Design a protein with these regions (language model features):
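A generic transmembrane alpha-helix motif of multi-pass inner-membrane proteins
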Residues: 1-21, 396-444
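Membrane-interface "cap" regions at the ends of multi-pass membrane proteins
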Residues: 1-59, 167-173, 189, 246, ...
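Helix-loop-helix module between adjacent transmembrane segments
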Residues: 15, 74-167, 225-226, 314-322
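Hydrophobic alpha-helical segments and their helix-loop junctions in multi-pass secondary transporters
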Residues: 17-25, 91, 131-138, 147-158, ...
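Membrane-interface helix-loop-helix modules in multi-pass membrane proteins
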Residues: 34-101, 224, 236, 246-282, ...
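Select transmembrane alpha-helical segments in multipass membrane proteins
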Residues: 41-48, 85-86, 116-129, 158-159, ...
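Hydrophobic, small-residue-rich membrane helices and short re-entrant helix-turn-helix hairpins
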Residues: 102-111, 171-180, 232-265, 281-292, ...
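Loop-to-transmembrane helix boundary motifs in multi-pass membrane proteins
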Residues: 116-120, 329-365
Length: 444
């Protein structure tokens, strides 16, 4: 435990020094929330990767691969392929809109077409969806801390404090710089863990696909919201505002795709190897699959377990910082419409972190399922983006109907536990968009 605390303290000190250096700059909202649109393509790719590949991966996906087999890896690879396709098709368009109109919050893209009410309601819906998703990161951290004798509540508290201080002081520029360093570290540790599992366990247990868990309908239901993650999740859309030069977007996509492919395969194989270890009698049967990585860390020597714990912390802090900053930018600019005042932005950074802290204490579900539930709610933004870039129909009614009605559908299917909830939500948001478009046409 002492070694872990020392390494954790060193990590916090180094990150805080970077953040404090950045904090000395005079920060406008554009500087604080999107780094003044000056990020290099390498930094953009690594912060995009570190934001995306969070505790969901090394904690959630390892456990999912252990518990459900090959379908877990296919599910994540479908996400990666869809994300790369979305970035290729929409990356430059979104960057151009942000640069031309001075957008800082992703919801600002909707204001001219769908009205300021849609912009504000969209920010509120994103807030409802992303607080649980951010809590996934904090819960993942607390589980890792537990391996070193730190209680769950204490772990949640420590994680929340790190997230708050870095986001509050450094803004996006500080977060992006730490992300770039963390991205390299995460990959190096993942490769080391893969090497260790290959030596520790004999073979892989991947099950088959489809299987009893990964039925075709279940696969579609869980993958559908994830496939559109790059368009529907505001924190990753906002990342496209930060890159300095549109010529770097192609390079950024290639680097991100390469990182994502290697990291996904490694993480999945670790889960498959752990399941083989259970079948061989080396590991016990692990009922709570979110603790698989913790069980593995208990078997590793400190030389590997400590860096692995830190890599999960890195990924979780990165994603949480991004979400907190994006939510703060939306509440500041889209709901309260304060586009010059930096104080309110920092206040919302504190409020968002506090809410994430409180929600994390509940630990409501498995990390992967909680992430998918959040992404399901965010499907409400998909028709709005499609309409913005491809259709001429749709105005205020289309925007409001889709955001409000779609969010209600998503929450209801989550509460009712509908087995095809993502499919119902996907169909529902498009139906609502077209009904709203007809209403707009009638009012015109």
């Amino acid at each position: 435990m002492t070694q872990f605390i020392v390494l954790l303290a060193l990590y916090v000190i180094i990150g805080s020094v970077i953040v404090l250096i950045v904090a000395k700059r005079k920060q406008t909202q554009e500087e604080f929330f999107i780094g003044g649109r000056t990020a290099h393509w390498i930094v953009t790719a690594l912060t995009y990767a570190a934001t995306t590949y969070s505790a969901f991966m090394m904690v959630g996906l390892v456990g999912m691969a252990y518990g459900t087999g090959l379908g877990a890896m296919i599910f994540e690879l479908v996400y990666l392929a869809a994300t790369v396709l979305i970035l290729v098709v929409y990356g430059k368009r979104i960057w151009h809109l942000g640069k031309t109109h001075g957008y800082v919050s992703p919801m600002e893209m909707f204001a001219d077409r769908y009205g300021k009410l849609t912009e504000a309601l969209g920010a509120i819906v994103a807030f409802v969806a992303l607080i649980p998703y951010a809590s996934v990161q904090v819960i993942g951290l607390a589980l890792v801390f537990g391996n070193y004798g730190i209680g769950f509540v204490a772990g949640v508290t420590i994680a929340s404090l790190i997230i708050f201080v870095w986001a509050f002081l450094g803004g996006l520029r500080g977060v992006a710089l730490t992300d770039a360093l963390q991205g390299f570290f995460m990959m190096a540790v993942a490769i080391a863990v893969l090497t260790w599992t290959g030596q520790e366990f004999q073979g892989l247990e991947m099950s088959t696909f489809p299987n009893q868990v990964w039925t075709p309908l279940f696969f579609i239901n869980i993958t559908l919201p994830w496939a559109f993650f790059a368009l529907t999740n505001p924190q990753v859309v906002q990342r496209l505002f930060i890159i300095k030069d549109p010529a770097g977007i192609k390079k950024m996509i290639i680097l991100f795709a390469s990182f994502g492919l290697v990291y996904t395969v490694i993480v999945s194989v670790v889960g498959f190897a752990a399941k083989a270890g259970t079948l061989e009698g080396i590991l016990p049967m692990i009922e709570d699959r979110d603790t698989v990585i913790v069980q593995l860390m208990g078997r590793m020597g400190a030389v590997l377990a400590l860096p692995l714990g830190l890599s999960i912390i890195f990924a979780s802090v990165s994603t949480s910082n991004s979400i907190i900053l994006t939510l703060a930018s939306m509440m500041t600019r889209d709901v309260f419409r304060m586009r010059k005042n930096m104080i309110i932005g920092r206040v919302f950074t504190f409020v968002m972190t506090l809410l994430v802290f409180l929600f994390s204490l509940l630990r409501p579900d498995y990390l992967v399922e909680l992430s998918v539930s959040s992404s399901r709610i965010l499907l409400v933004f998909l028709p709005l983006y499609i309409g913005l870039f491809h259709w001429k129909l749709g105005g205020v009614c289309a925007g409001v109907f889709t955001v409000v009605g779609g969010a209600i559908i998503a929450v209801l299917v989550n509460v009712l536990g509908a087995s095809l909830g993502s499919i119902y939500t996907f169909i529902g948001v498009f139906v609502l968009f077209f009904i709203g478009a007809l209403c707009d046409r009638a009012l015109d």
